[in-house]
């Protein structure tokens, strides 16, 4: 066993130096974060299937640009996320103003003023729903002009092409890099509701998620090579990633970044070792959990993946 070493913070300390400091500190999540960087660097280099999952709330923060950069950097070739991520990515592309607020704000007063609150981010009503609706109308009309039936991932590829020019857009980055974005809960937000309303208005478009599942089968059923995943947060995007991974024998590398705990039996809090029992992560895998707010931990991890640490 290595000894715990004391860390000294010298002037001009780099991110690489900070991660080395975390490795020396070791207790308690510092060592986990340093190990996560090691696992991901090894896994992303070795794997043919490289998965990134994240929850929609993060896209309402400035972490949106970091997530887009991870995709644009070619580190991942499969993305799983939630309907909220689509809404926030589109709304911000359309000029929506997301404001720095406070957790302890008066929500009744915010409602009366037409402001949504997402944690300590304030979203004026006009910066959200109406912008997504306007974008989806254009998207649906363009899609219907090509063909009648679409998978969700195919629509999102088209959406990303319409968002080209926004370097911080997740969908635009995915479209540029040819990365498929899968959103199993796609109806559960403004994007899905707006598509439904366009269908009700008479736009000739049908969404068939079985097309997405066929594409996922193409990705995950082949047994060649290895698979790695960076899973940020929990919920449906986390589960869809590990669910499909079981069909190739499980993930070879897995890093979870979460604030959820396993003691309530929730999917979001479930530890990688629990996924081993389901065959979703391999017994022989390299795996680590980093407990902490992703808006703090992920930028450090992402920097090391993009620019190198250690």
Curated annotation (Swiss-Prot):
List its EC numbers: 2.5.1.46
Tell me the InterPro entries matching this sequence: Deoxyhypus_synthase_arc, Deoxyhypusine_synthase, Deoxyhypusine_synthase_sf, DHS-like_NAD/FAD-binding_dom
**Gene Ontology terms: cellular component:** cytoplasm
Keyword Heme in annotation: no
Q: Which Pfam families match?
A: DS (PF01916)
Name the pathway it acts in.
Protein modification; eIF5A hypusination
Q: What domain of life?
A: Archaea
Cofactor(s) the protein needs: NAD(+)
Catalyses: [eIF5A protein]-L-lysine + spermidine = [eIF5A protein]-deoxyhypusine + propane-1,3-diamine
Residues at the active site: 280
* Purpose: Catalyzes the NAD-dependent oxidative cleavage of spermidine and the subsequent transfer of the butylamine moiety of spermidine to the epsilon-amino group of a specific lysine residue of the eIF-5A precursor protein to form the intermediate deoxyhypusine residue.
Write down what this protein is called.
Probable deoxyhypusine synthase
Tell me which species this is from.
Aeropyrum pernix (strain ATCC 700893 / DSM 11879 / JCM 9820 / NBRC 100138 / K1)
- What gene name is listed for this protein? dys
């Amino acid at each position: 066993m290595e000894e715990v070493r004391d860390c000294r913070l010298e002037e001009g300390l780099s991110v690489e130096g900070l991660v080395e400091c975390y490795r020396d500190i070791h207790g308690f999540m510092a060592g986990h974060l340093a190990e996560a960087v090691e696992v991901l660097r090894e896994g992303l280099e070795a794997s043919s299937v490289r998965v990134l999952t994240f929850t929609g709330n993060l896209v309402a923060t400035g972490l949106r640009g970091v997530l887009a950069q991870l995709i644009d950097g070619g580190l991942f070739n499969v993305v799983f996320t939630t309907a909220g991520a689509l809404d926030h990515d589109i709304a911000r592309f359309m000029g929506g103003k997301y404001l720095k607020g406070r957790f302890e704000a008066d929500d009744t007063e915010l409602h009366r003023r037409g402001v949504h609150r997402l944690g300590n981010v304030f979203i004026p009503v006009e910066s959200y729903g109406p912008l997504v609706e306007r974008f989806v109308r254009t998207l649906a009309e363009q899609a219907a002009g090509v063909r009648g039936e679409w998978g969700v991932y195919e629509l999102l590829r088209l959406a990303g092409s319409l968002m080209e020019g926004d370097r911080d857009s997740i969908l635009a980055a995915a479209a540029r890099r040819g990365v498929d974005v899968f959103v199993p809960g796609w109806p559960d937000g403004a994007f899905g509701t707006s598509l439904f309303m366009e269908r009700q208005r008479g736009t000739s478009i049908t969404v068939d998620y079985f097309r997405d599942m066929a594409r996922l089968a193409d990705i995950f059923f082949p047994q060649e090579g290895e698979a790695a995943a960076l899973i940020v947060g929990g919920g449906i995007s986390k589960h869809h990633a590990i669910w499909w991974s079981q069909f190739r024998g499980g993930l070879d590398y897995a890093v979870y970044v979460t604030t959820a705990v396993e003691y309530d039996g929730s999917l979001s809090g479930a530890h990688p070792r629990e996924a081993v029992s389901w065959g979703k992560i391999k017994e022989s895998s390299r795996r680590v959990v980093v407990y902490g707010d992703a808006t703090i931990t992920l930028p450090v991890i992402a920097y090391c993946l993009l620019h190198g640490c250690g």
